[in-house]
């Protein structure tokens, strides 16, 4: 490490291809690493999707057991020790929602001057009850007592974790989930090649979905949709990219419903921008979300997106690509909406890029905003 280089420690559950992880990596790739370097503290000591890239970019990876694997006091002590042993750090940036207050406390005890708590979700579970709300208030007090800066991917996520009053006081930095807009720009000429490389059908309606296999992503609803389309005789293929604890269960359910010839399980996909070119429409029926990076990526790719109204309307970039539907709507309404959207015209490439950049979804532009949060000044941040 050179003497002028600043190091920032990001804390996440694991560096797989989730929304928060992808957002951080998009910023990391654009950062001038001769001046600012990222390191990562995670709760997983098994290999994750982004590990090799992090190491190749000069970052380091550290591990501590999660708060659920230990207890709050032990967790804070472990995080503090990891910070002190591997620092100094100019900032610690925590992305683990309600746990961020414990991380900010550990960073304060370790003497880190800038401690950032970042909200990426509008809830952390389904069936949010009064006990959960009381717990959230306790976590919020811990965050506000120890963080020097608050960030959120959108207003709803900021309001959920930090409270309405802090949003009104403009204490929360809104940092949209920026991406590489040029990388995701539509390229229809490459679609056939990308389909062939992944075993995706060349002559069917391709319905795409990219997410980890967790309850909140509602993969069971996608299988219900697939069964309905099959009953109607629609020639389609549902392409599911991602991995996670429910993957085996969902695949078995697809087998039991005789859907394996119509549903393709791709596993973890490294080149999402290429995969997007193979889709005719993107579907996301999540039970709740913050502001998903993948929906920004889908719109940047020119894809019509049919999403649940549990996802914030602020994800709609105004390109005419997003349709929000209630999960209580008949499955036939979803199917008809998908068919219409897939057949509709698409906005032009330059219009997409300009619109998303104006909304703050250009990762290159967001680098400067993030450095301001860290109180780090650099002349230029154009290293790729």
Curated annotation (Swiss-Prot):
Pfam families: Glyco_trans_4_4, Glycos_transf_1
EC number: 2.4.-.-
SUPFAM superfamilies according to UniProt: UDP-Glycosyltransferase/glycogen phosphorylase
UniProt-recorded Gene Ontology molecular function terms: glycosyltransferase activity
Statement: the UniProt record of this protein carries the keyword Glycosyltransferase: yes
Keyword annotations from UniProtKB, A to Z: Exopolysaccharide synthesis, Glycosyltransferase, Transferase
Keyword Cell membrane: no
Enzyme class: transferase
Disulfide bonds: none
Induction remarks: Repressed by SinR.
One GO-annotated biological process of the protein: polysaccharide biosynthetic process
Task of the protein: May be involved in the production of the exopolysaccharide (EPS) component of the extracellular matrix during biofilm formation. EPS is responsible for the adhesion of chains of cells into bundles. Required for biofilm maintenance.
Family: Belongs to the glycosyltransferase group 1 family. Glycosyltransferase 4 subfamily.
Identification of the protein by name: Putative glycosyltransferase EpsF
Gene: epsF
